[in-house]
Amino acid sequence: MAKLALNAEIYCDDNWTDGVPRNGKEIFFTVDGEKLNAWQTCIKYCNKLAEVGYRLEDDYSYNFSVHNENSNENIFTIPLDKNLYAAQFWYLFRSRHYNHGGALGGSSENGTSANISTVLANGYSTDDVDARFEKNFYAGIVEVDGKPVMMDNGQQLEYFPLELKLNLTGSSYVKTAGARMAKYEVDRTSHSDGRQPDNDIVLFRYADALLMKSEAKVRNGEDGSLELNEVRGRVGMPYREATLENILKERLLELVWEGWRRQDMVRFGVYHKSYDQRVQLADEKNGYTTVFPIPQKSIDLNPKLKQNVGYK
């Protein structure tokens, strides 16, 4: 419910291309018999999470450990157990170099890497690198159990976070470009070449709720610094003022690899704009990419459906 309220401006807008966004202060919910606007509703439900005992774990990485089912922070997860379920978790498998995966007792596809804007937001290669960067990414020279991981050409494996790969040519450059996912602890006893670990997949956790509460407070004209800096303080990062810009950045730093970025960027009104290497499409200024196109097959089956504005 907290997520629904936080995104109410987007969900209640039936014309996202007219340049007139909805106002969360004028969207109302009834909660426990009380009429609250969207931001107050989000805050109310975030408070309810604290009331039932959810809290930040002292160790950020514990939420992604092999036995993270005992986390007091994780609210909604997809349970994984290699001995009980056939479900697989491909994020780590797809990200690492295949020799890196092999050194960990499994395999990998050498694919997914962080984009450069994410790496720069973490302060990589500066004196102000975020404390979560090394917890979330493999970067630089790779070692496993204190031993270097070697590439097929005899060179030591090293990931280059500021290198960009667009075409998967199979070259050494492509195999080492980009920071790779390291957020989840590696289950060295996993099945299916590392695709069936015991780590539960985290979908929603209390740190997210705190950042949601901070954002809702700011949008409602209140101070959200307490919640923002509770999240930052857990990893030893200094105080930061709770502005919408800072909250959006904090959500990137804290929740990277957790699947919220597109929703966040749409809510903050920046998804369709130019940033870093992302160039705005010529006809995108009206924000039509806020929503996806309706598949043509669905329109063919139901003539009453009309394609979303901006798509042909």
Language-model features, listed with the residues they occupy:
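Long, intrinsically disordered, low-complexity segments
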Residues: S65-A103, S107-T112, D193-Q196, I201-L203, ...
